[in-house]
């Protein structure tokens, strides 16, 4: 295996330790701990696992963690009313609504109801627009986490041909904006892209987020490329794999993220970072 491993687990722990140290400094200075409200509607098992990891991370760094586990029958109006009250709550710096929401609740309306300065997921049109305008505030967690990995490993991005596979609002689209901001020539591919292989073979930096195990054959990877695999797919055997065929890709790439232990841990660590940022940049002024 020639590729160097980008260890997201280690970097995520570094980020958490840094945030925990700032929380301790805040408390020593007589300031309050940052607060995160996590809202889960219904009982989706995958969502319950994600929510538990976010709450645990909050407690580890010394945040105030508030949990709102709402029944599946919760109406859109009830959820919007909860968001309104959390927007006004001076102990809460971040509001996280775990997606997907049940049928009958409008995702867009719900995410837009969160005040932009408490939008620690970075999904609000205001925050996406700030990134578009090259003046980011709160940034989407997974793309920001990927940029943190590249920075911590001193991997330069200026002038690289970057290819993003997948154009979701959560990863692909904000990722393309992050890469533009980082000086890359950026291509976004999606289900209508013709000759996907051609784009990937020319990618100096490849970010794949489609949710299909082994979707990108290792043979397509450009020798020496940086491969960021966002996919987390559980096979019937129980094994967790990414969207890139890892073994062959790792023989060709210069750098690669493993699955698990690559991008995944960074998403939660960045949520924690964003919550601290929201507290210090937006809410300290009015609080202290």
From Swiss-Prot:
One Pfam assignment: THF_DHG_CYH_C
GO molecular function per UniProt: methenyltetrahydrofolate cyclohydrolase activity; methylenetetrahydrofolate dehydrogenase (NADP+) activity
UniProt keyword Oxidoreductase, yes or no: yes
Known partners and oligomeric status: Homodimer.
Protein name stated in the entry: Bifunctional protein FolD
Pathway: One-carbon metabolism; tetrahydrofolate interconversion
GO biological process, one term: tetrahydrofolate interconversion
Gene3D superfamilies per UniProt: Leucine Dehydrogenase, chain A, domain 1, NAD(P)-binding Rossmann-like Domain
EC number: 1.5.1.5, 3.5.4.9
PANTHER family in the cross-refs: C-1-TETRAHYDROFOLATE SYNTHASE, CYTOPLASMIC (PTHR48099:SF5), C-1-TETRAHYDROFOLATE SYNTHASE, CYTOPLASMIC-RELATED (PTHR48099)
A GO cellular-component term linked to this record: cytosol
Native organism: Yersinia pestis
Binding site for NADP(+): 166-168, 232
UniProt function note: Catalyzes the oxidation of 5,10-methylenetetrahydrofolate to 5,10-methenyltetrahydrofolate and then the hydrolysis of 5,10-methenyltetrahydrofolate to 10-formyltetrahydrofolate.
Domain of life (superkingdom): Bacteria
Lineage, broadest ranks: Bacteria, Pseudomonadati, Pseudomonadota, Gammaproteobacteria, Enterobacterales
């Amino acid at each position: 295996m020639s590729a160097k491993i980008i260890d997201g687990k280690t970097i995520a722990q570094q980020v958490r330790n840094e945030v925990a140290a700032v929380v301790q400094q805040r408390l020593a200075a007589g300031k309050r701990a940052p607060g995160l409200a996590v809202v889960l509607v219904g009982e989706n098992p995958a969502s319950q696992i994600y929510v538990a990891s976010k709450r645990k991370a909050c407690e580890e760094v010394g945040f105030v963690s508030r949990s709102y586990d709402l029944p599946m029958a919760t109406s859109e109006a009830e959820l919007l009313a909860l968001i309104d009250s959390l927007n006004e709550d001076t102990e809460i710096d971040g509001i996280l609504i775990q997606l997907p929401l049940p049928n009958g609740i409008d995702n867009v309306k719900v995410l837009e109801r969160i005040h932009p300065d408490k939008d620690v997921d970075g999904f609000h049109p205001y925050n996406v627009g700030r990134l578009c305008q090259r003046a980011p505030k709160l940034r989407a967690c997974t793309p920001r986490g990927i940029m943190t990995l590249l920075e911590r490993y001193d991997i330069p991005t200026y002038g690289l041909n970057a290819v993003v596979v997948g154009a979701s609002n959560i990863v692909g689209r904000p990722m393309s904006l992050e890469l533009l901001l980082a000086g890359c020539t950026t291509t976004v591919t999606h289900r209508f892209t013709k000759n996907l292989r051609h784009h990937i073979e020319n990618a100096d930096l490849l970010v794949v987020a489609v949710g299909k195990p082994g979707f990108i054959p290792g043979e397509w990877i450009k020798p020496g490329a940086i491969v960021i695999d966002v996919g987390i797919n559980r096979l019937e055997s129980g094994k967790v794999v990414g969207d890139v065929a890892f073994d062959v890709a790792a023989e060709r790439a210069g750098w690669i993220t493993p699955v698990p232990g690559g991008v995944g841990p960074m998403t939660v660590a960045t949520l924690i970072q964003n919550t601290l940022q929201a507290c210090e940049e937006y809410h300290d002024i009015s609080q202290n």
